[in-house]
Amino acid sequence: MQWIRWFSEIGIDDVPLVGGKNASLGEMLRELTPLGVPVPDGFAITAEGFRHFLRANSLEQKILALLATTEGVADIEAKSLAVRELVLAGTIPPDLAEEIRAAYRDLSRRCGEAALEVAIRSSATAEDLPGASFAGAHETMLNVQGESAVLDSVRRCFASLYTPRAIAYRNDMGFAHDAVSLSVGVQKMLRTDSAVSGVIFTLDTDTGFRDVVQIDAIYGLGENIVQGRVGPDEFYVHKPTLRQGFKPILWRRLGTKELRLVFDRAKSRHDNRLVPPEERARFCLTDDEVLQLARWALAIEDHYSEKRGQPTPMDIEFAKDGSAGSLFIVQARPETVHAARHGLTFKTYALTERGAVLLEGLAVGEQIASGAARVIADASRMAEFRPGEVLVTESTDPNWEPVLKQASAVITARGGRTSHAAIVARELGIPAIVGAEDAMTTIANGRVVTVSCAEGETGHVYGGALAFRTEDVDPESLPSTHTRICMNVGDPTRAFKLAMLPNDGVGLARMEFIFASWVRVHPLALTRYDSLPADTRVEVDALTARYADKREYFVDTLAQGIATLTAAFWPRPVILRFSDFKSNEYAHLTGGAAFETPEENPMLGWRGASRYYHPDYKDGFLLEVAAVKRVRETMGLTNLKLMIPFCRTPEEGKKALAVMREGGLVRGEGGLEVYVMAEIPSNVILVDRFAPLFDGFSIGSNDLTQLVLGVDRDSVRVAPLFDERDEAVRRMCAQLITGAHAAGRTVGICGQAPSDYPEFAAFLVEQGIDSISLNPDAVVRTKRRVAETEARLAATFSVAAPTGNTPGPARATPAAEVAVGV
């Protein structure tokens, strides 16, 4: 055949012949199906077939004349309509039409059907190229059946080369309109409308973090994801440990999935139908299916990376056939947003003032922007939009892109992180908040708002134009240090971004943040559920509805938070401190009031190690242990280390370690390291007795200062006396460093002082501390200060030259591995 190529005959080098989409389908069918990646069969109508159609209808010069100049959105829309009307009025030449009919009959026979249902997709010759993202610009027709319907759909695909979005994008990218041609793919249609479909990215779409596979899934046909009509289920899988054979599903987030797009065969049209509440309340993919999709995604990424000779993150579409119950890959293309960004330099954003929160939703990106809100109900009113405004609408599709390019930020009432609005916002580098259900009614037209996506997974819309600061960070420009520079991290949703800062790992991962924001239930409210008051049981039931075993809710949810944070810094060490709430803070968790007795001074009361072995909390601590065990053993994240807080005596340390052993965590087994916070004078005075029990010490400067100076750090009246730089505190730190090193143990610090006082960080370096763990916003400036101090010491004492930022001993110490920020 002259104008037909079967997928099995084409590959990634055939983009000029069959376009990026079809070339990729052929590549996968030929090269990856033998490796177990299933791709539905089909054929491509070549770009030369499209040009044959244009010539046969004398359209080439007419189209070029219409598109010779385009000025503004309205002009592009008018000329787009004129060109598409010309194409749709054209006739497919008989020789081309017969080849298409014959190929369709052959495909139907191959699939055992008289007249096969097919998906018909446009595939531009400039599509899916690095730096060019035509995805969504051209037409796709689903559930097409019969020769006449196939021919009609092919003509509609031809016309879609001239949609307003496609014309505008070619203008922006500098592609001549006659230099880009179109191929059409005809592929076996899966019964996805009765099952599941979705998208896969082999990186985190918000940050570009490349060690994860992100999977979004919905019921029915996949157009609802792209159009942002529903909130999908979301899954993250860790690539490195998946390759090692583990099952590292880092997190699962249940989407709204309120609509299912189906094909109504009686009416020959696609309809959105409401999904029953019981289906919405469960994930649409099983864990085994998530892991299978992630493995296929790795195989696809590996293949394309080898083919291109460079790492190539991928944007993949999958579908589940409702008839066979099997998963298939239906598209794959190189990811273009993060691939187009070069170098390691990145910008950080932070609000410097606060305002009233008007609205919340899913944050897309890490930026902050302000502007007047423009609330637009539908695309017919796009002309009302003015450059620099904040677009507020239900959802967007490719028709909105001329407006999106002028927006300072985007807010949509529907959609998830892989919706059209989210994808384009990332591409344009503007903040977007999606899935903000009340956006259309909460934000008044013309009101000045600030859109912040710099505060974790939740995006906030504030009233007014709030002040914020930015900082450009180039890790390559920062000096190397002997002292390992780590970070204090609590929010797992910020971990992927924070891991891009120059660092040697996490010196303090705060479990209590995950307790409060992810788990939200007191552990004993789950182990002793039957003793709860009736109204509290209702609250607990709402949070644990998907879990038959309420204990499993706690373990699973806590493990997801820990795993996400730990995976972000893999393989650098992450030191997780077991829960260190005070009794009044535990009481604020759902169900907590039933298990916490009010204390006069919770700061010095029942906290830290003393809770872990006590009969009144031991069951809760064992759930913490079970979550950690799952992260290390099921997910394979063995870079996770542990830390015991507020351990008053060596005997308490032994008891806490014994309970950990009871729960299956044994120091030394599987490389497990356990550290202890040095925040009580007894930890310093008895350093020689604590050292045999633990792998290292972490100075908690906040509590240590409080207890050395006898100052309640929560008291306003004595607050001026609280100073980590006091000579007594400095002497305690120096004594601990000397004693720990003498015992063959390492010392770090994870308290607030080095972040607030650069001179205190310099003092610690002078004392020989092994690592300093800082708040993320202090990493860059403190790293520079530490390098200056080390250079001064080197000049004075002839210390060896810096060794860089890779994990390793800070200086010649005994056999124990150097602790990261502990």
Walk through the language-model features, giving the residues of each.
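N-terminal beta-alpha lobe that positions the nucleotide/phosphoryl donor
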Residues: 1-185, 194, 280-288, 292-296, ...
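Conserved short loop/turn motifs at secondary-structure junctions
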Residues: 12-14, 45-51, 84-88, 174-175, ...
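Conserved alpha/beta-domain cores
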Residues: 115-119, 124-134, 139-141, 179-183, ...
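Extended active-site and interfacial segments that coordinate phosphate-rich ligands
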Residues: 134-168, 192-265, 330-362, 406-413, ...
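Conserved metal-phosphate-binding beta-hairpin within the catalytic cores
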Residues: 136, 309-336
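Conserved catalytic alpha/beta cores of large enzymes that bind or transform nucleotide phosphates
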Residues: 212-313, 319-323, 354-370, 378-381, ...
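Acidic, glycine-rich flexible loop/linker segments
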Residues: 323, 337-339, 367-390, 394-509, ...
